[in-house]
């Protein structure tokens, strides 16, 4: 068990484990999952995150022992106030970049504050990803679950206290949280307002990547992933339960808190990870390695090595390559890249890419360092130096990402993004090598 920075919160360490936790001693049945009478008069309930017959290495499921079963709810009704889920915008092959979205003036809780940015599949498909930016200034009083996919939260501003069915975790900038599909949760704002990024993964659950020749250690180490311990609410009284189903919000009113799980065991769990613990791998000789070495989490497809979605970070690191153009190289890619910035500056963009902002480089969109960065890199003294006080990230996917209509029409879309490459000169001289 691991104690986090908050003195009242504890976590279980590891990734993909068969965890077990109980808030009351003896609340977990011994030797079976569904006894005739569960301890303390609890109900046994199974939450499946994958099909029953998946390989054991792929299986995600958790047994919950709760005060009331989830089946105890009235009919869901479609809410009058729906999330901003506009249709995908017109086809647009251009490189796009957005300035940071403003925090709303009117009271907005976490689930009201999603701005859809890009997507590549409707929610009913068992693959693809939808990407949002969230902006909120009010803690949730209701409880939410997402039937459409697994949620990866990347805070950029403001700490979040996330009360889930399995326990409570806190995350802030430079940390991430993952919440399984269908798991109920409530988000409280610890700093009054919050902004960040969301990847809604419609495909296979996220996992840490294989290390291959790197060996048995490196990148995101399993022990640094933290899952909350069991914690339950026994509150009586009206609570709104909201679900996101095929992009729409539907709600019902309960007379109790649905976060009433007293004990649980399994592998389908929420977790958090501190990005500062990422063991960065890089060259110690020459050239800039492929950015796949910065992968924190991946959602695979049935094609070996082809990701439904990768979550990649560009953390502080030493640059020591000799006789090398050290920024990320110019590139045209089969994959689609949505980038965000949590803090500092990105080493391939001297200006215009700000914390809370975003960019999209679609399939085969030419991209790379801007003119100012390129000029400095070519002339740089190649002494070892550290890129510090920065954290950029990328959601990368093998399916084409299309921006939403809101993302194409919002005032934060930078009309002059292409100009950052406009002054790249031709330095070719056939008479001088």
Swiss-Prot record:
Pathway named in the protein's UniProt entry: Amino-acid degradation; L-phenylalanine degradation; acetoacetate and fumarate from L-phenylalanine: step 4/6
Q: Needs which cofactor?
A: Fe cation
Q: Does the keyword Metal-binding apply?
A: yes
- Give the InterPro entries listed for this entry: HgmA_C (IPR046451), HgmA_N (IPR046452), Homogentis_dOase (IPR005708), Homogentis_dOase_bac (IPR022950), RmlC-like_jellyroll (IPR014710), RmlC_Cupin_sf (IPR011051)
Instruction: State whether keyword Metal-binding applies.
Output: yes
> Gene deleted: what happens?
Cells lacking this gene are unable to grow in medium containing phenylalanine or tyrosine as the sole carbon sources, and accumulate homogentisate.
- Enumerate the UniProt keywords alphabetically: Dioxygenase, Iron, Metal-binding, Oxidoreductase, Phenylalanine catabolism, Tyrosine catabolism
Record family assignment: Belongs to the homogentisate dioxygenase family.
Query: Subunit arrangement?
Result: Hexamer; dimer of trimers.
Read off the HAMAP family from this record: Homogentis_dioxygen
Could you tell me what this protein is called? Homogentisate 1,2-dioxygenase
Source species: Pseudomonas putida (Arthrobacter siderocapsulatus)
């Amino acid at each position: 068990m691991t104690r986090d920075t908050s003195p009242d919160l504890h976590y279980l360490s590891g990734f993909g484990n068969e965890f077990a936790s109980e808030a009351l001693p003896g609340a977990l049945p011994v030797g079976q999952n569904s006894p005739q009478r569960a301890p303390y008069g609890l109900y046994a309930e199974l939450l499946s995150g994958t099909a029953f017959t998946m390989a054991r290495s792929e299986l995600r499921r958790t047994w919950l022992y709760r005060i009331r079963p989830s089946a105890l709810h009235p009919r869901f009704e479609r809410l009058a106030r729906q999330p901003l889920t506009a249709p995908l915008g017109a086809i647009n092959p251009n490189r796009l970049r957005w300035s940071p979205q403003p925090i709303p003036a009117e009271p907005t809780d976490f689930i009201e504050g999603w701005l859809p940015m890009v997507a590549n599949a409707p929610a009913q498909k068992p693959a693809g990803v939808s990407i949002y930016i969230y902006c909120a200034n009010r803690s949730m009083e209701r409880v939410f679950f997402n039937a459409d996919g697994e949620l990866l939260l990347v805070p950029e501003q403001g700490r979040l206290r996330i009360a889930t069915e399995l326990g409570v975790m806190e995350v802030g900038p430079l940390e991430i949280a993952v919440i399984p599909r269908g798991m109920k949760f409530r988000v409280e704002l610890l700093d009054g307002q919050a902004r960040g990024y969301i990847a809604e993964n419609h495909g296979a659950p996220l996992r840490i990547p294989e290390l291959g020749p790197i060996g048995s250690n490196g990148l995101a180490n399993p022990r640094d992933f933290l899952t909350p311990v069991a914690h339950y609410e026994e509150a009586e009284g009206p609570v709104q339960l909201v679900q996101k189903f095929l992009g729409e919000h539907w709600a019902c009113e309960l007379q109790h808190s649905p976060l009433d799980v007293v004990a649980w065991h399994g592998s389908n769990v929420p977790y958090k990870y501190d990005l500062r613990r990422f063991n960065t791998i890089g060259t110690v000789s020459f050239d800039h390695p492929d950015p796949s070495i910065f992968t924190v989490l991946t959602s695979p497809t049935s094609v070996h090595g082809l990701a439904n979605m990768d979550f990649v970070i560009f953390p502080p690191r030493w640059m020591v390559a000799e006789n090398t153009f050290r920024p990320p190289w110019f590139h045209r890619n089969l994959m689609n890249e949505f980038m965000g910035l949590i803090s500092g500056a990105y080493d391939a963009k001297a200006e215009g890419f700000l914390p809370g902002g975003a960019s999209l480089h679609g399939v085969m969109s030419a991209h790379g360092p801007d003119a100012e960065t390129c000029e400095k890199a070519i002339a740089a003294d190649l002494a070892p130096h550290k890129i510090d006080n920065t954290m950029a990230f990328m959601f990368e996917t093998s399916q084409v990402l299309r921006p939403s209509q809101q993302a194409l029409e919002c005032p934060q879309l930078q009309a002059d993004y292409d100009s950052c490459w406009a002054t790249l000169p031709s330095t070719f001289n056939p008479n001088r090598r």
